[in-house]
């Protein structure tokens, strides 16, 4: 995942630090959003194709990950429809996976995040 530009949406400071460290340790470039609305705004203002993947927490204040993903997917630009969006959540039940798919998310990673799995899922998503 070296050289990838990743939008990381996470409201918990410790989780953000851990995820950011894991990603930067693998050579990725990380832009942080602290809630769903911020993630949508950062993506909307970015150049088309600027981000390679979005890591989206589900439970966030202001706007949750499901709503944020739906808004990103509805933007009038090509990359909004195809950018991989990976849910990161403590809720790893089948029902949550279905909700993530319905919102337009491509993958689902359970917290606490396993670094090797995270890298594998990102790599497979952008491949």
Residue ranges and their predicted role:
Residues 1-127:
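C-terminal compact regulatory domains
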